[in-house]
A protein has these predicted regions:
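N-terminal leader/capping segments at the start of a protein or of a new domain
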Residues: 1-20
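Acidic, Ser/Thr/Gly/Pro-rich intrinsically disordered interaction regions
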Residues: 90, 105, 117-123, 132-135, ...
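Histidine-centered catalytic micro-motifs
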Residues: 55-61
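A short hydrophobic beta-strand segment most commonly corresponding to one strand
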Residues: 65, 111-126
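Asparagine/serine/threonine-enriched low-complexity, disordered tracts
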Residues: 15-17, 128-153, 158
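Glycine- and acidic-residue-biased ligand/ion/polar-headgroup-sensing regions
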Residues: 50, 61-79
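A short glycine-rich, His/Asp/Glu-containing loop-to-beta-strand
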Residues: 22-52
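Short acidic-glycine-tyrosine-enriched beta hairpin
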Residues: 65, 77-109
């Protein structure tokens, strides 16, 4: 099974509106809003303005859960040695999971506003980013990206 099975079940069942408090967009880059952190995971509401994207990147050891709360987003999957596998279109309500055994990914927003929920475990991982076949160093999380920290634990009520 997946390394985040319990959290995956919770996120799949989540249909609340409390994330809308963090629905704020930026013209420069996607906006990462930290809404929960504990010893097991950190949770972000990420707001994507038109045509914003991540670099190709990896994840912390237990992986990442992504749920689309509004809009839709393209997810490109790559092998660990950065060979393209496929592109998936994630629409509102869709949940996907990735870890480093599955490979790397790049998230690309189209010409629309999108809001997504991301769970990473363990927390505070500084992802590795890749360009082509080349590893470009640590510090993906918040390095040149709009990184916003909120003290709210809005998801604790959902058992995370």
């Amino acid at each position: 099974g997946k390394k985040l099975d319990t959290a995956l079940d919770i996120i799949q069942g989540y249909n609340g509106n409390d994330w809308k408090n963090h629905r704020k967009f930026c013209n420069i880059s996607f906006k990462r809003n930290l809404v929960h952190i504990d010893d097991l995971c950190d949770i972000y509401v990420i707001c994507w303005n038109n045509n914003q994207q991540t670099p190709i990147h990896d994840h912390s050891s237990n992986g990442c859960i992504l749920k689309i709360l509004e809009g839709q987003i393209n997810e490109q999957l790559f092998t660990p040695d950065v060979k393209f596998i496929k592109q998936i279109v994630n629409k509102k309500g869709d949940v996907s999971y990735i870890d480093n055994d599955i490979g790397l990914h790049k998230v690309i927003n189209g010409n629309n506003k999108t809001v997504s929920l991301h769970v990473y475990s363990p927390p505070l991982y500084k992802g590795k980013k890749y360009t082509g076949n080349e590893y470009t160093g640590n510090g993906y999380n918040g390095n040149g990206y709009n990184y916003n920290i909120y003290n709210s634990n809005i998801y604790r009520n959902n058992g995370i």
